[in-house]
Swiss-Prot record:
A Pfam family hit: Gp_dh_C
EC number: 1.2.1.12
GO cellular component, one term: cytosol
Quaternary structure (record): Homotetramer.
Keywords from the named record: Cytoplasm, Glycolysis, NAD, Oxidoreductase
PANTHER family xref list: GLYCERALDEHYDE 3-PHOSPHATE DEHYDROGENASE, GLYCERALDEHYDE-3-PHOSPHATE DEHYDROGENASE-RELATED
Residues that hold D-glyceraldehyde 3-phosphate according to the record: 150-152, 181, 210-211, 233
Reactions performed catalytically: D-glyceraldehyde 3-phosphate + phosphate + NAD(+) = (2R)-3-phospho-glyceroyl phosphate + NADH + H(+)
Location of this chain's protein in the cell: Cytoplasm
Family classification: Belongs to the glyceraldehyde-3-phosphate dehydrogenase family.
Name of the featured protein: Glyceraldehyde-3-phosphate dehydrogenase
Pathway: Carbohydrate degradation; glycolysis; pyruvate from D-glyceraldehyde 3-phosphate: step 1/5
């Protein structure tokens, strides 16, 4: 039986997790909580999306929530996670997608309302992080609060895993050229902690920090301390790209690297890692399910031990799909 899921926070990731769950079929969304939007507005936001298009299905409202494709979904408006009555809906697995409750202690408040597990759709300072295809098999059923890491970590980790397993990574630097997100500004506005981040998103290339590369060391312990990185926020609405420049232990050719990644994309990382030799640009990957799509034509090698690898990701859709996949996976482990 499909695990019953609740979503806390109906913003970008919350809504796209919802859409993916409807398409996925392996999880059953039964409830949503968001104190900042009313039910009829939630229906509107779910139906129309500037990036991913109209919802392919039916959406109605009733006195207690939404009716999506004929199925009733409860809608709550609680500010305190501990006050959300997940238990009354049968929701065992909660997607914590507000971006606010990202520590184990804060996210665990959902358990007080009857939930059994919480998956944080963001990096966490202290919750164990899992990346599908990389370290998800290390999950054990005693873990109640976990993180799906970040969209960028989900892109970088499968790429780094294949390269490290086959050739060994001595050290590396990552840059993500990242589409703007909801935390950025439409016009120049105050941003006391990050002055550059307060500048207009649609007019600027904005250097920024990211913990995504360091986080790879948490999901692949042998790479701990070997990777770090930064971000360039750019004026595109969706789809981002990772540039991993690394020094290899084992001398190899770029063709051998391509072969290793192509093999992985067709076998152990199928559905997680994509591979393309087409002359694609970012918009071609809008709505792509993969965590990471290696661009064979975009990378270069300086010599047999020093390479630049390029991999794309839909930072909204692909990441949200992995949230759903992670819940489907851990529910099977929990049932054993």
């Amino acid at each position: 039986m499909a695990p019953k899921v609740g979503i806390n926070g109906f913003g970008r990731i919350g809504r796209i997790v919802f859409r993916n769950a409807i398409n996925h079929g392996e999880v059953d969304v039964v409830a949503v909580n968001d104190p900042f939007i009313e039910t009829h507005y939630a229906a509107y936001m779910l139906k129309y999306d500037s990036t991913h298009g109209q919802f392919k299905g039916t959406i109605e409202t009733y006195e207690e929530g939404l009716i999506v494709n004929g199925k009733k979904i409860r809608f709550f408006a609680e500010r305190d996670p501990a006050a959300i009555p997940w238990g009354t809906t049968g929701a065992d697995y909660i997607v914590e997608s507000t971006g606010v409750f990202t520590t184990q202690e804060k996210a665990a408040a959902h358990l007080k309302g009857g939930a059994k597990k919480v998956v944080i759709s963001a990096p966490s300072a202290d919750a164990p992080m899992f990346v599908m295809g990389v370290n998800n098999t290390s999950y054990t059923k005693d873990i109640n609060v976990l993180s799906n890491a970040s969209c960028t970590t989900n892109c970088l980790a499968p790429l780094a895993k294949v390269i490290n397993d086959k050739f060994g990574i001595v050290e590396g630097l990552m840059t993500t050229v990242h589409s703007y997100t909801a935390t950025q500004k439409v016009v120049d506005a105050p941003s006391s902690k990050d002055w550059r981040g307060g500048r207009t998103a649609a007019q600027n290339i904005i250097p920024s920090s990211t913990g995504a590369a360091k986080a790879v060391g948490k999901v692949i312990p042998t790479l701990n301390g070997k990777l770090t990185g930064m971000a360039m926020r750019v004026p595109t609405s969706n789809v981002s790209v990772v540039d991993l420049t690394c020094r290899l232990e084992k001398a190899t050719s770029y063709d051998e690297i391509k072969k290793a990644l192509k093999d992985a994309s067709e076998n152990e990382l199928k559905g997680i890692l994509g591979y393309t030799e087409d002359d694609i640009v970012s918009s071609d990957l809008n709505g792509d399910d993969h965590s990471s799509i290696f661009d064979a034509k975009a990378g270069i090698a300086l010599n047999s031990n020093f390479v630049k690898l390029v991999s794309w990701y839909d930072n909204e859709w692909g990441y949200s799909r992995r949230v759903v996949d992670l819940i489907a996976y851990i529910s099977k482990v929990d049932a054993q």
